[in-house]
């Protein structure tokens, strides 16, 4: 990928509105924090998952975010939010910058290569997955149909000295309950190979951590340490476990578990349909990340594995994303479906049947979000004792948006079900009453204001994108009714869909023919790009073209897309925010739809240049520095990347084969 560098001729920053989008050279992703900042750049973290637990590892080899047993449980390592809130480092003594880092291809196994003055080390990290192990007894947590592979609840770290001699150090200092309860260590046997960490208060209320290794563990207060000199050919393993599943006792056993974990991931990714294209690596990494954000026991899908990574440095826009949003989840299924990965949809729809009460004859209204176990109450609170990432307070757990009224969720849900049902030509019987209820909710409430797709904490408004998604609910609902043989519903719902569309076109379009953020106002909003991606209007409609180009030219900073202008939108918060990466990828897809292929490709290339060294994305990007902001990695961004990249690749292929581009049929 060759990118041309452009510089302003007048010495000032040129705005996107001055001309078409330009491709600039990639900027260093770590330009925000300085070397003196004790917090690593957000983009420096690696992401691990076993589809039950997630963790983040810094480039220095330190586990700085781990919540067990669930991703929304209190943290046991939380240094990403406070440097004293727990860590687990394994690496060479005196060296904190690795020679190289990568994921083993097709997996979520992180490999870090270290060079010292005297030798070389290779460290591999994984959350272990193995063959399904609950044979004689049923799992207490799994509600979905058992698969071939399952989490073993072990964080496994292996070390191999490949050249010379290297001094290896290990430091494991958990801090339970978000650093509110310290740890106490004790040996679990007569030798030094295993130790157990428990909470110093109410240990039965917190997980027990077991550290198993072929190193000699020393207990120093709240910390378990080890230090040894390795020579070429030496191998070390360290396993941290928190359940009854046995940890490896030898390096050979550890290596076998690492191989089985890689095999689990590769068997999953092999099912996908990936193009033979230079961007294939971005697609695969995004797909693996989305899979890693699933919670296999229930079928829920996380928005992100972290809480309170700031959208604005030292600002208040810090939120807990460790929950399952209906919107984010259904969009993620769209992205996976685009790549031929369809199995996760079955589990998520079963999760929806659970939380809506369809499986036990009850009827609950669909919420904006749920806990990964289906919890309906996600009360928000602030943890004042934590400094926050890079001193950005407050640190929040829970999310107060769970009881907001957001009218787009019915459309996203019905669209996702239709996307999968039309290829199978059937709807699960238990799901039809749930879907019918969502259509009825859209009919009942579409004329009312809501807080919109961006969950504004200001006053409810008549957001145009919410009305469009209500149209999607009725449009997809009518098509699902036809599949179900309910022709009267199909006819009735089509008529209401047309009523909604007429209302939007009468009240949500300005004098220029541009769709507006809300009724009665000319402000722009990036969510209106969904108007073309959901087929609300055809791509050749002049209002679609005007809207896409207005957003590209007027709602961008250095070519990257904002959600909205904060000075034009009452979102109930102070301060600025970065550009929303999902919106920039939406713009790529929308530009393809209206035939602006070259412009779309250039923007896509630029966005891919902002990826972290491990091809991961946070929620936002600071356009002038490339700094990642917000929770990390974020499902919303990765799903939009998949759709944008596939849009561009399909457009190129069609243009190459016929000389004429036909807009891609977006699944929505």
Swiss-Prot record:
Region spans: Disordered: 1-23
One GO molecular-function annotation for this sequence?
A: alpha,alpha-trehalase activity
* Record pathway: Glycan degradation; trehalose degradation; D-glucose from alpha,alpha-trehalose: step 1/1
Reported EC number(s) for this entry are 3.2.1.28
Which reaction is catalysed here? Answer: alpha,alpha-trehalose + H2O = alpha-D-glucose + beta-D-glucose
Requisite cofactors: Mg(2+); phosphate
Gene3D superfamilies, per database record: 1.50.10.10
Picking any one GO biological process from the record gives: trehalose catabolic process
Regulation of its activity: Inhibited by pyrophosphate and polyphosphates. Also competitively inhibited by validoxylamine and castanospermine, but not by trehazolin.
Q: Tell me which Pfam families the record gives.
A: Glyco_hydro_15, TREH_N
Give the record's pH note. Optimum pH is 7.1. The trehalase activity drops sharply at pH values of 6.5 and below, as well as at pH values of 8.0 and above.
Q: Which UniProt keywords apply?
A: Carbohydrate metabolism, Glycosidase, Hydrolase, Magnesium
* Keyword Lipoprotein listed: no
Highest rank taxon of the organism: Bacteria
Q: How is the cofactor bound?
A: Shows an absolute requirement for Mg(2+) for activity. Mg(2+) cannot be replaced by Ca(2+), Mn(2+) or Zn(2+). Shows an absolute requirement for inorganic phosphate for activity. The function of the phosphate may involve stabilizing the protein conformation and/or initiating protein aggregation.
As for what it does, the entry says:
Catalyzes the hydrolysis of alpha,alpha-trehalose into two molecules of D-glucose. Does not hydrolyze maltose, isomaltose, sucrose, cellobiose, p-nitrophenyl-alpha-D-glucopyranoside, and methyl-alpha-D-glucopyranoside. Is also inactive on alpha,beta-trehalose, beta,beta-trehalose, alpha,alpha-trehalose-6,6'-dibehenate, trehalulose, nigerose, and trehalose dimycolate.
Please give the subunit comment from the record: Homomultimer of 20 or more subunits.
Q: Which family does it belong to?
A: Belongs to the glycosyl hydrolase 15 family.
Know the name of this protein?
A: Trehalase
The source organism is Mycolicibacterium smegmatis (strain ATCC 700084 / mc(2)155) (Mycobacterium smegmatis)
